[in-house]
Amino acid sequence: ALKEEFEEHAEKAKTLPENTSSENKLTLYGLYKQATVGNV
């Protein structure tokens, strides 16, 4: 349920529009790492 939803959204994030700002990409990456690795 939750894990499948997370995986689905993680896949969608790989196809972001070209005009997505670096700041937004870094935010998404940080959230992804926090969800998969935890706080570092």
Curated annotation (Swiss-Prot):
* One annotated Gene Ontology cellular component of this protein: cytoplasm
UniProt cross-references to PROSITE patterns, sorted A to Z: ACB_1, ACB_2
Q: Which InterPro entries match?
A: Acyl-CoA-binding_prot_CS, Acyl-CoA-binding_protein, Acyl-CoA-binding_sf, FERM/acyl-CoA-bd_prot_sf
Annotated region (Disordered) at: 1-25
Location(s), subcellular: Cytoplasm
Among the GO biological process terms of this entry, one is: fatty acid metabolic process
Give start-end of the signal peptide.
none
Give the Basic and acidic residues compositional bias ranges. 1-15
What are the protein's UniProt keywords?
A: Cytoplasm, Lipid-binding, Transport
MF terms (GO), sorted A to Z:
fatty-acyl-CoA binding
According to its UniProt entry, what is the function of this protein?
Binds medium- and long-chain acyl-CoA esters with very high affinity and may function as an intracellular carrier of acyl-CoA esters.
The family line of this record is:
Belongs to the ACBP family.
PANTHER family per UniProt: ACYL-COA BINDING PROTEIN 1, ISOFORM A, ACYL-COA-BINDING PROTEIN, ACBP
Q: What is this protein called?
A: Acyl-CoA-binding protein 2
Say which species the protein is native to.
Answer: Digitalis lanata
